[in-house]
């Protein structure tokens, strides 16, 4: 909420500067975001009147202007602007002046003709030109000559930008901030000026009817203004609107915006001749209805959206935006001023559904005080007469079925002292509360606090205590040590394992990825999950952020593919990622919370293959002390490439899956690289982890290494080959490493060549070649016999 200090001073007197005021208001609970003084960089720029315009003798696009700047003689300025004429009043930067951005203006020559300054456009003064008018800034014809431009345009008027919390809609107004200012610095607050008279002869109740058909409209007020003159607002009003961040349009629209900023109550003006039925109806829209708003956008409505209607015809979305057909135009002669109060929750939901958030909806959704409607309407009528913009027809329509009444909170003043840790008298508390217009009566040790209707946030005794603390001063509340019992705790086993897993995977060259646990139900189609798969049985979120976040994930494969796809779209040639997250499995018993499983997901693409992924997994389980894992063919997982996927097992229990992602899945994520992914059940892994380490003496005897390369049928798993080698190698086979799998021209069709490096060591003696050859031959013969292998 931007509040010009000059506007604030209409309602409260103070002689401190904007910085000090901002600091004091922040300490009392009205947080100041920033203080803006737009004219700080502007010096020696004044208003000037163009007396004469002559052509430049040597340049067709330049003209020579004689400009009166309030001195003894006019000055000569050469310009290329085309939008001015004689007698126009413009900003003039004199010799030696400075402009925003550090621009300095000096005397000079343009094509041989002396120019003693520069006439300025809006942009050159640092003013946003929302109408995109090319050329000089033309000022009001009544602007005095030779005046400092900062004073004329209000650029020397500081603006304080407040961060208003949702529980204080009363502070979304100048008078709300004025109340806070008066209470904070302990001075008087002046109410907004209400002073107008009605014109006799016609009565609104004889020519306009209002029917409220829905409780979502809590109050509806209307007045008719006749003999309306549509013109520009006076400079003082335009200045205040612009400083508050609102673009001036015309006097009628500006009055509604001015009142909204000043009082905090949104208003709307209808062109009366467009309300052809002479009856305004407030009711909900019908599903599927179309309506074109003031911004020329056609919007689709539903039965939750509250509408303002001209009989049966829609003319405004209640509390959000008016319609294009009933807006005030240059030929408008009579208007209907609307000042109403609508249900805040409904306005917020409708605004979100329509993707249409306005200054009005932003206020209504915070539940405004219905009594503001009358103040705003009367203030608008006062401004109509002040600006001589029309005449107020006699009578007012006011439908207010359930009146809002002040709330009463009773609290013991001793409780407030104990709650805040201070010690002040009940009389002092009463003074603070009265300054905030929270009328207070002392009854013994009790304070009876009457909360006005504009303070909807005062409901319980803690609210009253907060108000006392704000004005007393948070900085005066003595600091105390919080009494607590220190409890020594450590990380749980799962937390410890997660930390270890993270360290292992990072040391393996992977980067951690973090993803949402809520996803779209459409992800199962992207990863080719069958319709009857248990993975599609998901936990649904009751109040989701949107369809893309409406269910809890049962697999992390989509999340990893999303992360890989994001890296690929940013032209990363190589990505190696991991995530430690959860999946959520619905309970079989209705009403029970879902089962959560911890999952490790590893994904990579680029200059990598299946064996890189497998190596990361094997390194992980080896460091975690998980023994005897095995691999088996996975033929029923459509997310993965058939024939290039395996399940990881501990004994006979499936620990996870790893393999190459199916090309169709990669295509669904627009990744034109082969992707490799592993999904491992961390909870099951945890049951088999052994982080304890035993000392083992360094070996005394050397190793002997032999390579072996065999041809086997294509469908034989590498795991089967390794199982045979390990059994026959016995205790002296220290390790075996797969270093090649080949299918090609030199290998018969239907076969593959598999090559291993076998490392032997005997802990009790040095192995001879004869010892090794004996075991090596035993391995080869068993491979030939069991798997039909051929030695290459």
UniProtKB/Swiss-Prot annotation:
Its EC number is 6.1.1.20. GO terms for molecular function: ATP binding; catalytic activity, acting on a protein; magnesium ion binding; phenylalanine-tRNA ligase activity; transferase activity; tRNA binding. It comes from the Bacteria. It catalyses: tRNA(Phe) + L-phenylalanine + ATP = L-phenylalanyl-tRNA(Phe) + AMP + diphosphate + H(+). GO terms for biological process: phenylalanyl-tRNA aminoacylation. Its main location: cytoplasm. Keywords: Aminoacyl-tRNA synthetase, ATP-binding, Cytoplasm, Ligase, Magnesium, Metal-binding, Nucleotide-binding, Protein biosynthesis, RNA-binding, tRNA-binding. HAMAP family: Phe_tRNA_synth_beta1. Tetramer of two alpha and two beta subunits. Belongs to the phenylalanyl-tRNA synthetase beta subunit family. Type 1 subfamily. This is Phenylalanine--tRNA ligase beta subunit. It comes from Clostridium acetobutylicum (strain ATCC 824 / DSM 792 / JCM 1419 / IAM 19013 / LMG 5710 / NBRC 13948 / NRRL B-527 / VKM B-1787 / 2291 / W). The lineage of its organism: Bacteria, Bacillati, Bacillota, Clostridia, Eubacteriales.
């Amino acid at each position: 909420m931007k509040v010009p200090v000059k506007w604030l001073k209409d309602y409260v007197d103070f002689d401190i500067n904007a910085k000090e005021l901002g600091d004091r208001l922040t300490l009392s609970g009205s947080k100041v975001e920033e203080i803006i003084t737009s004219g700080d960089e502007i010096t020696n720029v004044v208003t000037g009147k163009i007396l004469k315009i002559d052509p430049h003798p040597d340049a067709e696009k330049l003209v020579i202007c004689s400009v009166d700047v309030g001195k003894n003689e006019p000055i000569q300025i050469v310009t290329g602007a085309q939008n001015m004429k004689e007698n126009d009043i413009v900003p003039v930067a004199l010799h030696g002046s400075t402009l925003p951005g550090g621009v300095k203006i000096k005397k000079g020559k343009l094509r041989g003709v002396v120019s003693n300054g520069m006439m300025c456009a809006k942009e050159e003064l640092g003013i946003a030109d929302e109408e995109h008018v090319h050329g000089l800034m033309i000022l009001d014809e009544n602007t005095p000559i030779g005046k400092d431009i900062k004073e004329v345009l209000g650029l020397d008027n500081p603006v304080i930008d407040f961060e208003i919390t949702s529980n204080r809609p009363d502070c979304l107004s100048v008078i709300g901030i004025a109340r806070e200012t008066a209470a904070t610095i302990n001075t008087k607050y002046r109410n907004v000026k209400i002073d107008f008279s009605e014109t006799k002869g016609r009565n609104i109740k004889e020519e306009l009817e209002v029917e409220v058909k829905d409780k979502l409209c809590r109050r509806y007020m209307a007045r008719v203004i006749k003999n309306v003159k549509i013109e520009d607002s006076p400079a003082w009003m335009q200045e205040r609107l612009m400083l508050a961040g609102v673009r001036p349009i015309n006097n009628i629209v500006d009055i509604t915006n001015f009142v909204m900023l000043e009082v905090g109550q949104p208003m709307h003006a209808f062109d009366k001749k467009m309300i052809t039925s002479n009856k305004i109806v407030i009711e909900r829209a019908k599903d599927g209805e179309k309506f074109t708003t003031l911004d020329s956008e056609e919007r689709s409505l539903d039965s939750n959206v509250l509408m303002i209607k001209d009989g049966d015809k829609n003319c405004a979305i209640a509390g959000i935006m008016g319609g294009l057909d009933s807006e005030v135009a240059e030929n408008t002669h009579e208007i209907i001023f609307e000042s109403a109060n609508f249900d805040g929750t409904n306005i917020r939901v409708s605004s979100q559904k329509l993707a249409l958030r306005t200054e009005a909806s932003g206020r209504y959704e915070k539940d405004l005080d219905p009594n503001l409607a009358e103040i705003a309407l009367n203030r608008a009528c006062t401004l109509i007469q002040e600006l001589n913009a029309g005449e107020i027809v006699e009578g007012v329509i006011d439908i207010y079925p359930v009146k809002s009444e002040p709330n009463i909170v009773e609290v013991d003043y001793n409780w407030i002292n104990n709650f805040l840790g201070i010690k002040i008298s009940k009389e002092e508390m009463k003074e603070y509360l009265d300054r905030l217009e929270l009328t207070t009566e002392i009854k013994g040790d009790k304070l009876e606090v009457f909360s006005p209707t504009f303070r909807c946030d005062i409901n319980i005794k803690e609210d009253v205590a907060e108000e006392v603390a704000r004005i007393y001063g948070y900085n005066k509340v003595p600091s105390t040590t919080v009494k607590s019992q220190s409890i020594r705790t450590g990380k749980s086993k799962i937390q410890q394992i997660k930390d270890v897993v993270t360290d292992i995977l990072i040391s393996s060259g992977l980067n951690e990825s973090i993803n949402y646990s809520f996803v779209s139900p459409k992800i199962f189609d992207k990863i080719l999950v069958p319709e009857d798969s248990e993975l599609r049985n998901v936990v649904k979120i009751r109040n989701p952020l949107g369809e893309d976040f409406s269910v809890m994930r049962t697999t992390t494969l989509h999340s990893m593919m999303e992360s890989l796809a994001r890296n690929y779209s940013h032209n990363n040639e190589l990505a190696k990622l991991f995530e430690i997250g959860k999946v959520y499995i619905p309970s079989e018993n209705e009403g029970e919370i879902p089962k959560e499983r911890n999952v490790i997901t590893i994904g990579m693409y680029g200059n990598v293959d299946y064996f890189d992924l497998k190596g990361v997994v094997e390194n992980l389980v080896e460091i975690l002390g998980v023994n005897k894992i095995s691999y088996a063919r996975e033929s029923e997982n459509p997310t993965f490439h058939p024939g290039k996927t395996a399940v990881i097992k501990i004994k006979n229990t499936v620990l996870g899956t790893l393999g190459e992602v199916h090309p169709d899945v990669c295509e669904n994520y627009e990744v034109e690289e082969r992707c490799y992914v592993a999904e491992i059940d961390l909870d099951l892994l945890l049951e088999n982890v052994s982080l304890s380490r035993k000392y083992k003496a360094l070996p005394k005897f050397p190793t002997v290494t032999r390579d072996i390369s065999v041809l086997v049928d294509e469908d034989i798993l590498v795991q089967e080959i390794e199982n045979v080698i390990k059994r026959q190698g016995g205790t002296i086979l220290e390790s075996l490493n797969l270093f090649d799998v080949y299918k090609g021209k030199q290998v018969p069709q239907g076969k593959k060549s598999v090559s291993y490096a076998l490392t032997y060591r005997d802990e009790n003696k040095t192995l001879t070649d004869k010892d090794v050859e004996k075991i090596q031959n035993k391995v080869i013969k068993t491979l030939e016999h069991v798997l039909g292998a051929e030695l290459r």
